[in-house]
């Protein structure tokens, strides 16, 4: 193996091994990568892979993701509950990464060779059980505060919109015992629906610069695309609820009626990691599932909404 070619001038994370093998970019993930938060440097394998591939044109033809499965991970004592949630999410993310980019991404081993991917068909989403908490208004830099400010401006620009949409995934029904990803805590920052398009915004403030924003957004857009395609659904008890929160019923109804035809993912930040170039966005848009990605500054987004 050769040293990885990277002409960006910016440091690589120490949490992932990077090598060049002929015309192939090889990422080697250790156990920490498999059980880390996807926005962490060690966990954001999609972000690092796409940035290196796109920003070094003509150098690489394929991306290989090498990893060692954690045996008996679903048994108590092998890994912690939190790590198990991250590992289930890794399995889904890795499977989707190859599914989204089948001509350039190869998993070694393939997820389907070590995990029954048919289980994904039985995963269900959790849903809001109440209004979100008021953000800490004294902290003007907090993403939660910025999120609420943007949501207020968004109200008149879309068919409907909201924030903190849960994306916890569970096996057949929502319970602590059946939790798969996020432990019920994962949520989409901001989202909107307009003319049949579901827009997913991954919001970062001016000091939160990370390649992991790519991995986060790709996870959320793939989950919502699977929801749109009826591969995921809300559990049966959702429709029996008397009260719904954060426009979850409107979204459910739109999806049930096949009114959502497209998913857009938007990196929403005034400053992004310098590796996240236009070349990276172009590569992200070459996915086989027709999710559209873009980046937009918070300032431009506000200006557009106020026109």
Where are these regions (language model features)?
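Charged, terminal alpha-helix-loop-beta segments
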Residues: 1-307
């Amino acid at each position: 193996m050769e040293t990885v070619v990277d002409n960006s001038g910016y440091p690589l994370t120490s949490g992932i091994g990077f090598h060049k093998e002929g015309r192939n970019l090889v990422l080697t993930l250790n156990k920490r990568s498999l059980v880390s938060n996807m926005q962490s440097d060690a966990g954001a394998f999609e972000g690092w892979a796409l940035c290196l591939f796109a920003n070094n044109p003509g150098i690489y033809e394929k991306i290989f993701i090498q990893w060692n499965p954690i045996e008996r991970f679903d048994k108590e004592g092998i890994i912690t509950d939190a790590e198990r949630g991250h590992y289930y999410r890794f399995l889904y993310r890795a499977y989707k990464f190859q599914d989204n980019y089948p001509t350039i991404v190869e998993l070694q081993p393939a997820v389907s060779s070590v995990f029954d991917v048919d289980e994904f068909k039985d995963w269900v989403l959790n849903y809001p059980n109440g209004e979100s908490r008021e953000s800490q208004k004294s902290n003007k830099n907090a993403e939660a505060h910025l999120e609420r400010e943007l949501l207020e401006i968004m109200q008149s620009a879309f068919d409907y919109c909201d924030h903190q949409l849960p994306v916890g995934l569970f096996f057949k029904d929502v319970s602590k015992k059946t939790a798969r990803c996020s432990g019920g805590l994962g949520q989409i920052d901001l989202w909107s629906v307009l003319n049949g398009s579901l827009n997913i915004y991954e919001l970062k403030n001016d000091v939160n610069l990370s390649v992991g924003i790519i991995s986060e957004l790709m996870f959320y857009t793939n989950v919502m695309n699977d929801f749109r395609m009826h591969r995921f659904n809300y559990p049966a008890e959702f429709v029996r609820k008397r009260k719904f929160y954060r426009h979850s019923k409107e979204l459910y109804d739109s999806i049930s009626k096949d009114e959502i035809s497209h998913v857009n993912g938007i990196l929403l930040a005034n400053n992004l990691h310098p590796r996240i170039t236009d070349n990276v966005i172009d590569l992200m848009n070459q996915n086989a599932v027709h999710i559209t990605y873009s980046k937009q500054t918070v300032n431009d987004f506000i200006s557009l909404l106020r026109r």
